[in-house]
Amino acid sequence: MFHQAVLDGLRPTEENPFKLLRVKPRETVKRAIDRNTIRRMAELELSHKPHLELARDLYLFSFFSRGMSFVDIVFLKRSRQEIDYYRKKTKQRLRIGLTPQLSALINKYDNNTEYVFPILNPNSPKPLYKQYRLALERVNRNLKQVGRMLGIETKLTTYVARHSWATQARRSGAPMAVISEGLGHTSEETTRIYLQKFDQSILDKVNEQLSEL
């Protein structure tokens, strides 16, 4: 859990007792969903299942906020003018203008804490990081149920929203530099590698076109 806290940006790297240990990460298949599926997700009537409604709304908020990471959403504090925060992972400052979609989601969860969404309880004896990790597991579990309701094969997680924003931005013709800035990456090379790993559908489409002799 300590190592994960460092990766999430909630503990400084110099405190990590495993920082000298080099373990090659297991490569996972990155997935994204298209805009039509996201639209259907937004239109789902979930008021009778508030736990699924919150999970869905957190996914949409991530997509509408340029793929904001779940950890940053959880710790995001209220602001009237724009979204202004520092990424936990890179400490980079990001600013996002409030669109009607973002404003609607923020106003929907007008809770009594300084945070945008009702996830963290500052008065709880449970550490905030522990609350965040439990929320991540819970939301991802609920998102999988939302995915089944939509009838899609992709296993929805909070991270799929980030992948989806990057994919749709690329397909819309956005320059790599713009996508990199939007995601809060420290370099375009990071974004290039990031996109390359899950943009399989574009490659398949090109290959199909070239195969039609």
Feature annotation, model-predicted:
Residues 97-100, 104, 108-109, 196-213:
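DNA/chromatin major-groove-contacting recognition/catalytic segments
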Residues 20, 75-108:
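Conserved tyrosine-mediated DNA breakage-rejoining catalytic core shared by Y-recombinases
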Residues 32, 87-91, 183-208:
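Catalytic-site neighborhood detector that most strongly recognizes the C-terminal catalytic loop/helix
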Residues 78-82, 152-154, 174-193:
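Short, polar N-cap/turn motifs at the start of nucleic acid-interacting alpha helices
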